[in-house]
């Protein structure tokens, strides 16, 4: 799949995940603010957050049993792995595995 199409698909899935998180759990204000700062480029926002090892959101999702909504869970999906450096995919895999996420 063409990389720009893949990025758009990832962005759309991130937006849907955020909507569901807002509805069911909490408002990820920092992430939403960063999306605006990066012109809705979720790939770049994620690279920044994962590189900083931000864990607040994933911890809240873990507490509610909703790790499948995490950005980390999106990143490790086979179709999106090529959008990210292997180091970021590995960090996300380790975080999720540590929390017992079964889709790895």
Where do the PLM segments sit?
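Amphipathic alpha-helical binding modules
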Residues: 63-104
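Amphipathic alpha-helical packing elements
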Residues: 17-66
